[in-house]
Amino acid sequence: MLTSLLLIVVLLISACGGGNTESAAPEAADGGEPIVTSERCGEPSQLSDSVSFYNWTDYIDPDILTMFEEECGVDVIYDTYSSNEDLLAKLQAGATGYDLIIPSDYMVSIMLQLNMLKELDHSNIPNLANLYPRFTETPYDPGNVYTVPYQWGTTGIGYNLEATGEVPDSWDWIFDPERAAQFEGQISLLNDQREVIGAALKYLGYSMSSVDPTELEAAKQAILAIKPYVATFDSDSFGDILVSGDVVLGVGWGGGYYQDIAESGNDNLGYVIPQEGGTIWTDNLAIPATAPNPYTAEVLINYLLDPEIGAKISNFTYYASANQAAEPMIDEEVTGDPGIYPPPETLEKLEFLTELGEGTLLWDRIWTEIKSE
């Protein structure tokens, strides 16, 4: 699977009306004729009054949602989460009002096993044609039966050069206790068990998706050894606290760091993929099986796959796009950065997180022990 997924990214470097019965099209405030929608809005008579979008924090330009609302006459009810596990837990707890979600690759596999995703009607998503070909045959969902790739990226280290003195291009900077002690109270880790335990496993030379009890115990001990120097576990504002100076080192998603660093204008701040490697991932648009407004969700997916919109997304998130038609409009600042579009020699060292199967319970226990000790 790793080879197939890696090929997706290497080739990137080298190189959207349905039949369900949702509520009627929005009417004018005075109860008159329906609002005239743009050609990007599907069949107006089938659009619902609103669509509920559950997304990662800071993972879309808010202007895009406003544009969709104004063009299509549909209110976007927007909510955010901080990890795939939070998303899964929310849905398993009985949340049935969400129309569109964005699970990562390994979480798609889990949700498919649990019958949690609705099959897509491709006739409502003609902009699927805008995807890079390899993103139409992902190992976790060949043919985009249930999902549409949205963005892809990496997990690495954010840093303040004034404090570190050099680019911290190794996991040693995080997991070596003697080195971490130099930055006591100034290190942040993601509040994400797959990423943090995975990074510790990588530091130790193991698979980032290991379910071996001995290897996982070693990873736990490595994290506990540096926990006294960790200021916070944060998946929402890890970039903000680097910019503010509250921390000088952190583990986080590349685009999250790039967004806040770009806004700060501080040339001493940066993001690096460790030389040992790290996580590479693909996030995907998907519709929960319980979605009340699947047609409108498909129209929103198609809207997000528009080339102009796709470029606007990446120019805001600082993540790489699965949308080939959007690439010419993505800022060179994004496409030319090796931390966003890594070179082949870096890609070879990156891993996709894979489903843990029965090992999930062990990972859950170890994460609980890490957070509670």
Where on the chain are the PLM-derived regions?
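C-terminal motif of bacterial Sec signal peptides marking the signal peptidase cleavage site
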Residues: 11-15
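Bacterial signal peptide processing site
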Residues: 17-20
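Early extracytoplasmic/lumenal segment of secretory-pathway proteins
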Residues: 29-110
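Extracytoplasmic ligand-binding site segments that recognize negatively charged/polar headgroups
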Residues: 52-61, 86, 97, 102-246
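A ligand-binding cleft/hinge motif common to bilobed small-molecule-binding domains
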Residues: 107-110, 249-267
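Periplasmic-binding protein-like
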Residues: 130, 153, 216-225, 231, ...
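A bilobed periplasmic-binding-protein/Venus flytrap-type ligand-binding module shared by bacterial periplasmic
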Residues: 158-163, 202-205, 281-296, 312
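Mature extracytoplasmic/periplasmic domains
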Residues: 288-348
